[in-house]
Amino acid sequence: MSQKQLKEAFVSNLSGTSVLEVTQGLCFPAFCILCRGLLIIFSQHLCSFLHTWTTQFFMDFVVLIVPLVITLTVLSSFILLENLTVILCGAWLLYQIYHRRTCYAKVPVQKVFASFLKISLESEYNPAITCYRVINSVFTAIAILAVDFPLFPRRFAKTELYGTGAMDFGVGGFIFGAAMVCPEVRRKYTEGSRFNHLRKSLYSVWPLVFLGMGRLVIIKSIGYQEHSTEYGVHWNFFFTIIVVKLITSLLLIIFPLNKSWIVAISITVLYQLALDFTPLKGIILYGTDGRGTRVGLLNANREGIISTLGYVAIYMAGVQTGFYVFKRRAQVRDWIKATCWVFSVAVGFFISLNIVQVNVEAVSRRMANLAFCLWVVASSLMLLSCLLLSGIVLSFAKFLIKGALVPCSWKLIQSATTNRQSESLIVEAEKNKPSFCLITALNRNQLFFFLLSNVATGLINLTVDTLHTGAFWTLAVLSIYMFANCLVIYVLDLQGKTIKFW
């Protein structure tokens, strides 16, 4: 077998891991983000630690990126233990901050909590959603290279037909995250007709057409390894995003924003019925001729084309989630209720997933069936609830330390009884503070980070024999690869540059 065939076989015919293990792995970065915020407060105001852009970058890289690299490689069998360790570290940091607090120093704990619950959280964007999207981007960047090394567990790679591998979450999670911040949710198009909004949406996808065609041409011209049952012969991630964006833009013109959940459920159920009671499933698996040939546009790309329906449903679920999370809430207690609600819905979806897998069909990324949609939405909501909870805990730590500033976190506003001058000072202090933050940098240039990671992955695969690389060199390559990618994005953010293609 050629090197290309060996690499294709290495990522083929896999069955994935348990839903629980994937969920534990997804929640792990949320707790790392909490620890990072608590560590910043602890070091800034209790240890007189000097924060320059270099020290902040190294702190972010070590606390946010390195643990995820290790989790996906050498410590992949100890995800639960890693979660518990990070939670305990966070609890210790919070304990230290509380007992060295500069605000409410001599006030009983009950009154401290009562005062905190009356605080408002001001934010031009929701840090939990920002962190959700960044986590998905970082996870994808690590996984697309790590999967070609033996150190990366095969159970985390994409499954062949049925199952839940960690990488199976990637595209669905990306689409869910994009939906939460889509223009319709952010009320970006507030003027003009609905068809004018559709025209703007059509215009916004042309860079993706360029990127999708560019990737197709490059992959075919250099003979790079492919997994044809993932999307098909010509289809790729960018084409899926294009079709999903076009269909959902039309749906959001027809249906009210707050009814997106009804659209999502309707599409998913009807699509599953079509899979069960029409030849659609057979077409996805074996083509129109029943022999699995790749002749003709539909047969060549049947997985990518048909599975788009499932991703449309995921997008609409993301729109509904964004609509709910971006609602204005007066006090911290309202955000606690919202977090509990998101968590409860996530649990409900996991229960529904179990029922569907037992009685209807198992999770299949290849078909993006009902179970897959339930799994992606449930996992996304669970991650989001962990991030919301982390944000609330971090806000409590900031509340205890006067002048505490943490990039990419909620800004605190005193209650209505506090004078307006002190309120504005709190917000302005955070606005005027330089943001040395890897999360903010990655969020600013997410698409460029994804492209940079893909190019670097391709170059490494063409120059390194990944199939026969030991554990030490695998970790070295992955660490250098992520360090270089993150540093480029970080420097761009320091210079105030956003790389756009339109």
From Swiss-Prot:
GO BP annotations listed: GPI anchor biosynthetic process; protein localization to plasma membrane
In-chain residues carrying the UniProt-annotated modification Phosphoserine: 415
Glycosylated residues (UniProt): 13
Pathway: Glycolipid biosynthesis; glycosylphosphatidylinositol-anchor biosynthesis
Cellular compartments annotated: Endoplasmic reticulum membrane
UniProt family annotation: Belongs to the PIGW family.
Biological role stated in the UniProt entry: Acyltransferase that catalyzes the acyl transfer from an acyl-CoA at the 2-OH position of the inositol ring of glucosaminyl phosphatidylinositol (GlcN-PI) to generate glucosaminyl acyl phosphatidylinositol (GlcN-(acyl)PI) and participates in the fourth step of GPI-anchor biosynthesis. Required for the transport of GPI-anchored proteins to the plasma membrane. Acetylation during GPI-anchor biosynthesis is not essential for the subsequent mannosylation and is usually removed soon after the attachment of GPIs to proteins.
Protein name: Glucosaminyl-phosphatidylinositol-acyltransferase PIGW
Organism: Rattus norvegicus
Native organism taxonomy: Eukaryota, Metazoa, Chordata, Craniata, Vertebrata
Gene for this chain: Pigw
